[in-house]
From Swiss-Prot:
Keywords: Hydrolase, Magnesium, Metal-binding, Nuclease, Secreted, Toxin-antitoxin system. Belongs to the PINc/VapC protein family. Its EC number is 3.1.-.-. Forms a complex with VapB5. Probable toxic component of a type II toxin-antitoxin (TA) system. The cognate antitoxin is VapB5. Has limited RNase activity on substrates; activity is seen with a VapC5-VapB5 complex. It comes from Mycobacterium tuberculosis (strain ATCC 25618 / H37Rv). It is found in: Secreted. InterPro entries: PIN-like_dom_sf, PIN_dom, Type_II_TA_system_RNase, VapC_family. Mg(2+) binds at residues 11, 100. This is Ribonuclease VapC5.
Amino acid sequence: MSTTPAAGVLDTSVFIATESGRQLDEALIPDRVATTVVTLAELRVGVLAAATTDIRAQRLATLESVADMETLPVDDDAARMWARLRIHLAESGRRVRINDLWIAAVAASRALPVITQDDDFAALDGAASVEIIRV
């Protein structure tokens, strides 16, 4: 039985799940969490692309809820990890959306798991120290 890690990186899907009322397995979410600049960008796109003012307000509230959270940047270590993961995917014949690849690279470069509801990360689980926790 695995234990909940001390810290982790929340993927965009966790914020969207909260916004839309999807259930999260809170017991698997670490006490210390951060997110990435990539997730912030995805949440901002959601605000800008909202079809109605009500949806825009809801998405803006989600974006604002992240304001005080530690936001991890894409740095040289993350870029090196991204390149390793990209080659791993090419060699294994699998694909991951580009933003998810960046989120995984930022997390793995800091030895942190990705906390997500997306199945998209499955192709990376275990690759180059990537740990994925589905909540």
